[in-house]
């Protein structure tokens, strides 16, 4: 008989509840995310998706919390706001806090990969919104994270730039296959990117969908459209005329 060792999930959440003051937000969440899986969190505003992501990131010290969770040691967080320090150049933003000897060379290579290698010595105020978010993505991936937590990172971008960022993210993460948790309000974005989609409702995981649409994904694919409609209905959106 062959014995197989159980593989621990990259993210393990056990009966996690979270509240702010007297306002409960998460209720008894239990969740396993395997290593390398891309998970999207969908839900209406106030459903708890950002609170769950911030819990995994170890943020919000003022929250009352019960239960437990475990994540890898090497975690990067990507926000909707690029959060670049305005007094530092782009490349200095990327290398801040890095101790590796090849930090500058690696940062330049990553900026080249995201298409803004020529902006390395520029300051954030001179960048467009899309360029800032490319720099933020480069900063997150430069640290070779085992877990990337992304809170609506493309929400403030125009539609064309957002599509370019989707393609860029998929190409970059294919190299290292980090585990990814993405918070988004965009159903199409979730279906385009994720391996798995969780729908949060009133602080609980109400639905868990595996995305089986083949890559490269196209909204015209019947399976894409079917899942999109099911997700929209679960979010309370009538799909008859969509």
From Swiss-Prot:
SMART domains: AAA
Entry keywords, A to Z: ATP-binding, Cell inner membrane, Cell membrane, Membrane, Nucleotide-binding, Translocase, Transport
Broad class of the protein's primary localization: membrane
Ranges of residues in domain ABC transporter: 11-227
Keyword Nucleotide-binding annotated: yes
A Pfam family matched in the record: ABC_tran
Gene3D superfamilies: P-loop containing nucleotide triphosphate hydrolases
Complex formation: The complex is composed of two ATP-binding proteins (SsuB), two transmembrane proteins (SsuC) and a solute-binding protein (SsuA).
Protein's name according to its UniProt entry: Aliphatic sulfonates import ATP-binding protein SsuB 1
Source species of the chain: Paracoccus denitrificans (strain Pd 1222)
């Amino acid at each position: 008989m062959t014995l197989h060792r159980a593989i621990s999930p990259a993210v393990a959440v056990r009966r996690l509840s979270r509240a702010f003051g007297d306002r409960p937000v998460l209720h008894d969440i239990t969740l396993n995310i395997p290593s390398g899986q891309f998970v999207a969190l969908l839900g209406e505003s106030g459903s708890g998706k950002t609170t769950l992501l911030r819990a995994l990131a170890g943020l919000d010290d003022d929250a009352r919390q019960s239960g437990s969770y475990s994540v890898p040691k090497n975690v990067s967080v990507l926000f909707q706001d690029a959060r670049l320090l305005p007094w530092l150049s782009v490349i200095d933003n990327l290398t801040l806090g890095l101790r590796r000897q090849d930090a500058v060379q690696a940062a330049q290579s990553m900026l080249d990969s995201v298409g803004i290698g020529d902006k390395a010595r520029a300051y954030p105020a001179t960048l467009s919104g899309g360029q800032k978010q490319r720099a933020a993505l480069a900063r997150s991936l430069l640290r070779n994270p085992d877990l990337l937590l992304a809170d609506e990172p493309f929400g403030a971008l125009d539609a064309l730039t957002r599509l370019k960022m989707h393609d860029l993210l998929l190409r970059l993460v294919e190299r290292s296959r980090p585990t990814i948790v993405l918070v988004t309000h965009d159903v199409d974005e979730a279906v385009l990117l994720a391996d798995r989609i969780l729908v949060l409702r009133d602080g609980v995981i109400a639905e868990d969908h595996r995305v089986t649409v083949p890559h490269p994904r196209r909204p015209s694919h019947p399976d894409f459209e079917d899942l999109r409609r099911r997700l929209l209905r679960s979010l309370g959106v009538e799909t008859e005329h969509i």
